[in-house]
């Protein structure tokens, strides 16, 4: 099992999704048949990460705790911390400094969805890299809208640029980051950007300047979905529905991942399914317990 810690940043005000998010965190909204938070949580679990910190807003923490508990039902350990105000993605490493404790970590944004057949292997490659940082690049047609990474044939990042007018790469940097134990120290030394935030790009640039920033490309066959707008939330739900209906297999199901990882057994899986048997999700878990995991 990896010693890497996991952080899900699920704070923010979700203003782009108003009025839907005026009364509830966007990470608790449904993406087809599961809460949005299940998707980044599943990425950490696929990477073998079992110690997880969820950072959210003060008035929503009880809702996350009610939904996820301490994670024991999935064989993981979930803790919680508050982001008092949305002061940048890199702030996660100040809030989570004691939790990380100088160990390697993975940060995933709470509104990002990743899916693809080789994702687990890609995550394991990043986890095996003990020194430096790894970002994940996704080919896009409009790189000028994103933070973009230029990298060599060995995956070493040469340059990163935020929404460049003339992009030198089509690979956008996604909301998934693997760091070694220096991330909190680097974050503590950052200065707020002109918009008053501790930028994740500046944290990544610390590793770039040290010659320790790597990129794992997510090429053909991968999906990276940002659910931060009404349209993208709708598209993500349609995508998940299509995949699941075609194959009859769940996408980003924590119970299934825990079962496949050997963190829970068939009996525990059936107990998790019991309260859900009135819907297809519960029936899926029951069938999974009987047939075994599908790889």
UniProtKB/Swiss-Prot annotation:
Record bears the keyword Magnesium: yes
EC number assigned by the record: 2.7.7.24
GO terms of molecular function: glucose-1-phosphate thymidylyltransferase activity; metal ion binding
Pathway: Carbohydrate biosynthesis; dTDP-L-rhamnose biosynthesis; Bacterial outer membrane biogenesis; LPS O-antigen biosynthesis
Biological processes annotated in GO: dTDP-rhamnose biosynthetic process; O antigen biosynthetic process
Role played: Catalyzes the formation of dTDP-glucose, from dTTP and glucose 1-phosphate, as well as its pyrophosphorolysis.
UniProt cofactor(s): Mg(2+)
Similarity field: Belongs to the glucose-1-phosphate thymidylyltransferase family.
Binding sites annotated in the UniProt record for Mg(2+): 111, 226
The entry's keywords: Lipopolysaccharide biosynthesis, Magnesium, Metal-binding, Nucleotidyltransferase, Transferase
The reaction(s) this protein catalyses: dTTP + alpha-D-glucose 1-phosphate + H(+) = dTDP-alpha-D-glucose + diphosphate
Protein name listed in UniProt: Glucose-1-phosphate thymidylyltransferase
Free-text comment on the cofactor: Binds 1 Mg(2+) ion per subunit.
């Amino acid at each position: 099992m990896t010693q890497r810690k996991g952080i899900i940043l699920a704070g923010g005000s979700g203003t782009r999704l108003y009025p839907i998010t005026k009364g509830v965190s966007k990470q608790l909204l449904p993406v087809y048949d599961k809460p949005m938070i299940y998707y980044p949580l599943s990425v950490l679990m696929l990477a073998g990460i079992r110690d997880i910190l969820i950072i959210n807003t003060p008035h929503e923490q009880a809702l996350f705790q009610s939904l996820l508990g301490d994670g024991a039902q999935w064989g993981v350990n979930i803790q919680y911390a508050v982001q008092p105000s949305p002061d940048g993605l890199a702030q996660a490493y100040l809030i989570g400094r004691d939790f990380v404790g100088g160990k390697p970590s993975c940060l995933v944004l709470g509104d990002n969805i990743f899916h693809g057949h080789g994702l687990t292997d890609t995550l394991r490659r990043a986890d095996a890299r003990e020194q430096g940082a790894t970002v994940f690049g996704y080919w896009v047609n409009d790189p000028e809208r994103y933070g973009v990474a230029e990298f060599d044939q060995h995956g070493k990042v040469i340059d990163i640029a935020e929404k460049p007018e003339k992009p030198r790469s089509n690979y956008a940097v996604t909301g998934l980051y693997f760091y070694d134990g220096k991330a909190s120290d680097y974050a503590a030394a950052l200065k707020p950007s002109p918009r008053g935030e501790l930028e994740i790009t500046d944290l990544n640039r610390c590793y770039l300047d040290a010659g320790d920033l790597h990129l794992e490309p997510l090429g053909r066959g991968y999906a990276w979905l940002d659910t931060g707008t009404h349209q993208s939330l709708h598209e993500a739900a349609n995508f998940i529905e299509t995949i699941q209906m075609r194959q009859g297999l769940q996408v980003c199901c924590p119970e299934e991942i825990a079962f496949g990882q050997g963190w829970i057994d068939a009996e525990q899986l059936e107990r998790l399914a019991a309260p859900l048997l009135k819907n297809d999700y519960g029936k899926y878990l029951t069938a999974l317990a009987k047939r075994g995991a599908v790889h």
